[in-house]
């Protein structure tokens, strides 16, 4: 979750739980590395094509930031909407040979969101 690197107000419990999972991943990467086990985390921004994001929630969040729904969904450096396929494709790629020598990495999938909010 992007809340590890860019937490927001009103999300203390959520942000703390995500940060704890991130730290656990880093420790396990050190402990299991000798066995060839790699652990990495992805930090997506909001993934809008999931059931969590109803029209009502999107409208409320956009209004909170004084943005249109489209502006809210693309409020990042690249001005792109992050969807579940984006996250899934990166997760699958990280299991392959391109990332075979990568462990304990924290990879954002957010279009640069933590740079604008």
What do the PLM-derived regions correspond to, one by one?
Residues 1:
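Residue(s) in the substrate-gating loop at a strand-loop-helix junction
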Residues 6-12, 79, 97:
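Active-site loop immediately N-terminal to the catalytic Tyr-X3-Lys motif
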Residues 14, 22:
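Catalytic tyrosine of NAD(P)H-dependent dehydrogenase/reductases that use a Tyr as the general acid/base
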Residues 17, 25:
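Active-site helix of classical SDR
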Residues 33, 38, 102-104:
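Short, small/polar-rich loop/turn modules that mediate ligand/substrate recognition or access, typified
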Residues 38-48, 108-110:
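Conserved SDR Rossmann-fold cofactor-binding beta-strand/turn motif
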Residues 47-75:
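A glycine/serine/threonine-rich, flexible loop-to-helix segment
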Residues 80-109, 114-115:
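C-terminal substrate-recognition "lid" of short-chain dehydrogenase/reductases
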